[in-house]
């Protein structure tokens, strides 16, 4: 199932055997997730990320560096050759479901019923259906019907 291991040489893992903890160690701070969100929405240049998030330059520089080191983003020379662009790697693109699930959770729990918010739509302008995990037979699963198998 794993495609590529993150470039995380020298990292100290919060919980080495837990995929959730490792993912959060790699991308879990607020600014990194917002940068990933914006990269998925077309941000490429340093100034794109800065304007969209309002992040301070020094923090943005640090987060972009970390995301590159960890294999989430890569730096590419812009077509003009005058600046660097930041684009998602395959590992970064694989975070799409995480961003969508986070967005959908926020739509349900972080806004008042009549409060307006942005909406993620498909190519035809239709809002995405709610993400729901299923088992191997396609049946819905949730916290009550799953468990974690701890490898020994």
What is each of the regions a protein language model found here?
Residues 28, 79-99:
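Basic, amphipathic "hinge/linker" alpha-helix immediately C-terminal to the N-terminal HTH DNA-binding motif
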Residues 16-56:
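N-terminal helix-turn-helix DNA-binding core of bacterial DNA-binding proteins
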Residues 46, 50-77, 82:
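Canonical helix-turn-helix DNA-binding module
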Residues 1-15:
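N-terminal intrinsically disordered/low-complexity leader segments
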Residues 23, 33, 70, 99-109:
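Alpha-helical linker/hinge and terminal dimerization helices associated
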Residues 1-4, 100, 104-152:
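C-terminal regulatory/oligomerization modules of transcriptional regulators
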